[in-house]
Amino acid sequence: HNSDSPAVKWSSDGTVEYKMTTADKSDRGTDIIMYIDSEHKEFLEKDRIESILKKHCRFLPVPIVSGKKQEWKDGKYVETEEDNVINNTEPLWKKAPAGLKDEDYTSFYHQLYPMSMDEPMFWIHLNVDYPFNLTGILYFPRVKSNLDLQRNKIQLYSNQVFVTDSVEGIVPEFLTLLHGVIDSPDIPLNVSRSYLQSDSNVKKISSHITKKVSDKLNEIFKNDRSQFEEKWDSLKMFVEYGMLTEEKFYDRAAKYCLLKNTDDKYFTLDEYKSLIESNQKDKNDTLIYLYASNKVDQFAPIDEAKQKGYDVLLLDGPLDVHWIGLLEQKIEKTRFIRVDSETIDHIIEKDDNSSIDLSDSQKEALNEAFTSQIPKLDKTNFTVEFKTLDETARPVQITQNEFSRRMKEMSAMQQGMAMYGEMPDMYQVIVNVNHPFVKQLVTETEGKEKDSIATYAEENSKLKQVIDLALLSSGMLRGEELNNFVKRGFETI
């Protein structure tokens, strides 16, 4: 301030042109006068003005006064003599973490997100002054379902002035799932995302935040394993997303990321490998990780696997199909196979003994009998396969190849894979040639012509029942076929 200098008036009509002239003003300070046309009168409303100020200036380091505070008196609100300061000049992220309590962090979280009903799981207080300036607080939100995940919840400030809530290009993509505040004067403003990604300070800030997040997760895992397991279902998608998109984060997270089995027990990658490696290696010495995506729908194959002494993981998240593909690349001689993608006797191939004691003509006759009675489902193809299983195993099972099913699932989330989404679902009808009922079918269809086999199969109520039971156990018996199945059941009463 120079008391001898004349006041200056800056004026503009809203274009890039402006004028500067001397003005008649003796008191210190700046008056900003904006003129609103008749079409934008809502910007003169008190609530509208305060909402704009609160969004962009609610943590400005100097007080902002908007009128006077009001109180309820004599049945109405009246103004008091106290100024209505709408901003917090000393936000929590500017304070020393040592002097703060958990209540301070949760209270500030609800100040940032007043519509949130849940408490954050935990938080990270950032405070760096070299080689760049960075302060802030990042919160891990409590996720109840995949639909709760929202991006653009991190607010970027520069010296306590709000800049944006779109921080892509400033922090790694997976960190955009977090909530909170980042404040740094070293992040260039009003530049393209491509420029941000190449800026040296932004790279350092991004790397630092990633490391702090990983260190916090590792700290909780080491110091309180039970708490970490309790929170894992909410953390899982965040950690998997980070491992899929950030190589350095994968290397750190591989030590503490968890696998949950169908008995709700948690294991690290190393712990689970030790658990199954003595019993779940195939003939090629590949370690087979069996998993289910739904404990209810896949109860039967899960139960069969457990009776074999196998352990089954529960992988029911939207990123799991991508994540297990990454693990198969990273961990040598490892395969993930869903427990219903093959019969339990063949899901982990221990030897090459898979001979079928049927002639080609017997196979053709049996194939015709089953094919003629399998219902025609939209965008679904069935292929009959013969396998030698235990005679106490089910006579017919429906399976779906791991690769084709996985490609279909990935196509639903990933651009460039639409061709897999348009392909029909491919299922295998596994016929157990060792089962007494199938042996009887072989005898009764042998030597018959194709047409007569179809007629025989049409009249064989047991064959229809066996096929429908296989479809029912796979959740594929619907509509007319399900209704006919129920009718046949009542007819036996």
Segments from the language model and where they lie:
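Conserved GHKL (Bergerat-fold) ATPase module
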Residues: 1-493
